[in-house]
Amino acid sequence: MIRFITIPDFADYQVILKLMEDYVNKVISDHEPEIIYLVEHSEVYTAGTNYKQEELLNYGDIPVIYTGRGGKFTFHGPGQRVIYPILNLDSPNRHKDLKLYIKMLEEWIINSLNYFGIKAYIIKDKVGIWVKVRKDEFAKIAAIGVRVRKWVTYHGVAINISTDLSKFSGIIPCGLEDSLVTSLNQLGIHVEMSEFDKIIQTEFNKIFK
């Protein structure tokens, strides 16, 4: 059984990044067990390896951190559950297939949202998890950005629970102009983070056996 570790309070992004990187090295060199960090960050914009500087619009006093994960700009902050799985895809019960791993992440989050009555989708050529908010119009509810070192995964998924969505106006989220963002709260689903975490853990064990 993989251990989920909940980081208390609002965590500094750079502190968690170092925590992840250190643990990835331990998995690679010392064969430490797989774990998953559950984090709620203090406000920060992060840029993935495919970012364009013009996609950073007006960040004000929110720090901007350039990371090694895939993807472009996104926002992390209170009310958002960020999930960092550190999994060894080279272990006997896994597959050395990054596309399959991302597909499994998507299925995991979609199933978790479905528990709360939210029908979520993946959209061709658009990274992340989406929900229909109006006819033929979708909003992103979860962002995905991962990295792999010697087949050990890190970075992960950010799901908007009760996030202040106005903060996304400081960037072009994931490089998608005119794309909408949403949250469970905005969809009328009010859930405590601890309750959401229980479902995340249950659904994880169904997908990542």
UniProtKB/Swiss-Prot annotation:
Pathway(s) where this gene product acts: Protein modification; protein lipoylation via endogenous pathway; protein N(6)-(lipoyl)lysine from octanoyl-[acyl-carrier-protein]: step 1/2
Compartment(s) of residence: Cytoplasm
GO terms under cellular component: cytoplasm
EC number(s) per entry: 2.3.1.181
Active site: 174 (acyl-thioester intermediate)
Catalytic activity reported: octanoyl-[ACP] + L-lysyl-[protein] = N(6)-octanoyl-L-lysyl-[protein] + holo-[ACP] + H(+)
GO MF annotation terms: lipoyl(octanoyl) transferase activity
UniProt keyword Cytoplasm, yes or no: yes
Pfam families in the record: LplA-B_cat (PF21948)
Principal location class: cytoplasm
GO biological process entries: protein modification process
Chain positions recorded as substrate binding sites: 69-76, 143-145, 156-158
Domain BPL/LPL catalytic: 30-209
Site residues by UniProt (Lowers pKa of active site Cys): 140
Record keywords, A-Z: Acyltransferase, Cytoplasm, Transferase
Role this protein plays: Catalyzes the transfer of endogenously produced octanoic acid from octanoyl-acyl-carrier-protein onto the lipoyl domains of lipoate-dependent enzymes. Lipoyl-ACP can also act as a substrate although octanoyl-ACP is likely to be the physiological substrate.
Misc remark: In the reaction, the free carboxyl group of octanoic acid is attached via an amide linkage to the epsilon-amino group of a specific lysine residue of lipoyl domains of lipoate-dependent enzymes.
Similarity comment text for this entry: Belongs to the LipB family.
Protein name: Octanoyltransferase
Source organism (scientific name): Rickettsia peacockii (strain Rustic)
Gene designation: lipB
